[in-house]
Amino acid sequence: MEIFAANWRLAAVAALFFVGIVSRRTGVASEKQGRALLAFVFNIGLPILIFGALAGVQLKREHALLPVAAICVSLAGWGAAAFVARRFGLPRIGEGAMVMCAMSLNNSMIYPFAALSLGAAAFSQLVAFDMGHALLVWTVTTVVACKYGGHADDIPVLLRRTLLAPPLWVLFISLALNLGGAPIPRKFLHAVLLVGQFAILAVPLAMGLLVSARGLRRPEVISAVALRSGFGVLVGLTLVWLFGLSGSGAAIAIIGSAAPIGFTAVVLSSREGLDLDLAASAAAISVFLGSLWIPLAMFFVPR
């Protein structure tokens, strides 16, 4: 029973995705509502989630290599996805969506299993890994999304779209409060985190409204899924060797590197006018597969 209680998010993701599909097919809602939901998540849901997750987490020096590993995984995914997309002959918006899929890690799917299975030390290592990814997503990845969205030649527009992104400002504010030792009540942060987790559930609902049967069968969609987890785990193994990681730190780096496609790939693809069908379809498949392999992977993390 504990495993089901700890993973209500996975059940909610599956249910909301199904509701989105049914709503679109019955004409209750359409792609327009799906894009509106993603705009809500980007401007409101994600900032709330980031503040609740990062403002109070303990930052330790011994975890310094794990954020670096997360950043390296995302950057390597960028290069690999750009190469594969060009082999497919995808247009700019298709290449951009594939890059978003490769750069965005859905570590939030790992948290429920980690909270149930791991000790405090290993769980804090997962948080450290995720912080590196969060920092990259709302800086470099956001700029990359703007670039593929057609703003690369207009530097003022590129900077404005990046610097005015609410998640970026909340990320900096959260880290500043954390490093400054601001006395924020734990109960308040926990409540904010719960609100953010509920708000982010609008993404699978939007994915259901946006995904298509044709999209799920596209070869570039399958390639995006393989890049995120298959190529990601190879990069993770390489980084473990290069950084000399061992024990739970090595396991967290490998599992985190293979994490499913993050919902931020769908959100940023929507914001910048990229191939949303590709991003939503790939994320849907990746999340489903992650729900199968992540629980098994937890057994290999040293306690």
Residue positions per predicted region:
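Alpha-helical transmembrane segments of multi-pass small-molecule/ion transporters
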Residues: M1-R303
